[in-house]
Amino acid sequence: MEDFVRQCFNPMIVELAEKAMKEYGEDPKIETNKFAAICTHLEVCFMYSDFHFIDERGESTIVESSDPNALLKHRFEIIEGRDRTMAWTVVNSICNTTGVEKPKFLPDLYDYKENRFIEIGVTRREVHTYYLEKANKIKSEKTHIHIFSFTGEEMATKADYTLDEESRARIKTRLYTIRQEMASRGLWDSFVNPKEAKRQLKKDLKSQELCAGLPTKVSHLISPALKTLEPMWMDSNRTAVLRASFLKCQKK
């Protein structure tokens, strides 16, 4: 799983995930499923905010290429991925500037158009179940919740999905691709079932102990890259941007 994560996610995302885990005393090399989950969540948060701006009239607009003459402001403030101290500093600054209620838990994003914090969820289970868990934890109607699943389902507070359909479809496609790539490597079942993953980890560690004294041979050959899926609703410009933003997965 660790190899998969490092091959299939942008190095910046991998680095942020490693820092987040180490901040809580967790090891990405051991808790590989959590490593994959954090990288996935980070990527969804970044994709959520991609291309979305507010123009000089205060209207939301989608811009795929930078125009130096345009007076644009990022629609979303990304809070997820920052260390806790900096994240709370950003949250406090937003609250002081906008007057919105300070959340009890760190949210993932702030939407300057709707003036609300957003909690993003990515689940391997039923979206309804995960949504209720998030809502019960946050216990605030001020924070907007948006849940995505690896099966293409989604659920949001009051069925308000914030983004346009194409932007959400882009996120769903990426999640589906991650699922398919995990499945092709035999990683999906253990990712969905953490208990099975722990059992496999113990088995692997035991095997490493038994083989510790044996000579090893490492292959440095690089396998062909797998082409990124290009769904029919993506035009060539958007696809080019995505190709530049995300690394291609490699087959084993």
UniProtKB/Swiss-Prot annotation:
InterPro entries: PA/PA-X, PA/PA-X_sf. It is found in: Host cytoplasm; Host nucleus. It comes from the Viruses. Keywords: Decay of host mRNAs by virus, Eukaryotic host gene expression shutoff by virus, Host cytoplasm, Host gene expression shutoff by virus, Host mRNA suppression by virus, Host nucleus, Host-virus interaction. The record marks 195, 198-199 as: Important for efficient shutoff activity and nuclear localization. Gene3D superfamilies: Influenza RNA-dependent RNA polymerase subunit PA, endonuclease domain (3.40.91.90). The active site is at 80, 108. The record marks 202-203, 206 as: Important for efficient shutoff activity. GO terms for biological process: viral RNA genome replication; viral translational frameshifting. One of its GO terms (molecular function) is RNA binding. Pfam families: Flu_PA. The keyword Flavoprotein does not apply. Belongs to the influenza viruses PA-X family. Plays a major role in the shutoff of the host protein expression by cleaving mRNAs probably via an endonuclease activity. This host shutoff allows the virus to escape from the host antiviral response. Hijacks host RNA splicing machinery to selectively target host RNAs containing introns for destruction. This may explain the preferential degradation of RNAs that have undergone co- or post-transcriptional processing. The probable endonuclease active site in the N-terminus and the basic amino acid cluster in the C-terminus are important for the shutoff activity. The C-terminus acts as a nuclear localization signal. The C-terminus is recruited to host protein complexes involved in nuclear Pol II RNA processing. This is Protein PA-X. It comes from Influenza A virus (strain A/Silky Chicken/Hong Kong/SF189/2001 H5N1 genotype A).
